[in-house]
Regions:
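Start-of-helix register in tetratricopeptide repeats
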Residues: 17-24, 41, 58, 92-93, ...
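Cys/His-clustered metal-coordination modules, chiefly Zn-binding fingers
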Residues: 153-231
Length: 231
């Protein structure tokens, strides 16, 4: 109750930076209710968070996860697409849940079409390979190997190359021992790379913190997949 009172007081301050902080407070309150299985109040405070900050990725992600857990897959897909629209850097954060929701909705082609549209502005190799692998599994319109090779050469990266070698090995087109050695080396390099970085103070690591533990800023920690994609 005290947390809600503080958030409501701060919400009255007409300042965008403050509204962003209030949105995070509402997300914290929503998480508390979610832990106590009070889904109605959890949903209420997520909507309040978005009302405070329409660009709040955290609230939209939580909303998608809540919808998915309740079996409202189409609503979850809608929220996940909003995450990408608000901040394309979070694309890889939503792909697993998005795949699940599309599959549960019986719309396997829908995911392929969405990823294809994302590739226009984000031509990362690992995203392209995700699409290739997904199409192989689902039997959707498949990408030719020639087109795949051309993309890997055009957009070289450590992460993309690692995924590409895995696919080639799985298809039996590469001697096992050679592929294993290359994969082992690539994965050691990738494991040393940070997954997230605070834009405010530069703190980098493997965990996504909505409030940076070093500088205490809210919402400044972002995925660095794009950075790792540059090779």
């Amino acid at each position: 109750d005290k947390a809600i009172e503080i958030a409501e007081t701060l919400a009255k301050i007409k300042n965008q930076a403050m509204h962003e902080i209030v949105a995070h407070y509402y997300c914290e309150i929503s998480h508390f209710y979610l832990d106590n299985k009070d889904y109605e109040r959890s949903l209420l405070f997520l909507k309040r968070a978005i009302a405070q900050d329409k660009q709040c990725v955290r609230a939209e992600l939580a909303l998608a996860n809540l919808y998915s857990a309740q079996g409202s897959y189409k609503l979850a897909i809608k929220s996940l697409k909003k995450v990408y629209a608000k901040n394309p850097e979070f694309l890889y954060e939503i792909l697993t849940t998005l795949s699940f929701c599309y599959e549960q909705s019986g719309d396997e082609k829908g995911l392929a079409e969405f990823v294809e549209s994302c590739l226009v502005d984000n031509p990362q190799t690992s995203l392209y390979l995700f699409l290739y692998d997904y199409m192989q599994k689902t039997g959707a319109n498949k990408i030719s190997k020639q087109r795949l090779h051309e993309h890997v050469l055009k957009y070289p990266s450590i992460v993309g190359l690692n995924t590409f070698v895995k696919l080639v090995e799985k298809e039996g087109a590469w001697p096992g021992d050679d592929a294993t050695t290359i994969l082992s080396s690539l994965e050691k390099i990738i494991s040393s790379l940070p997954r997230y970085k605070c834009n405010e103070c530069g703190l980098a690591g493997k965990m996504l913190y909505w409030q940076c533990p070093r500088c205490k800023s809210w919402g400044e920690t972002k995925p660095v997949y794009a950075l790792n994609e540059r090779g």
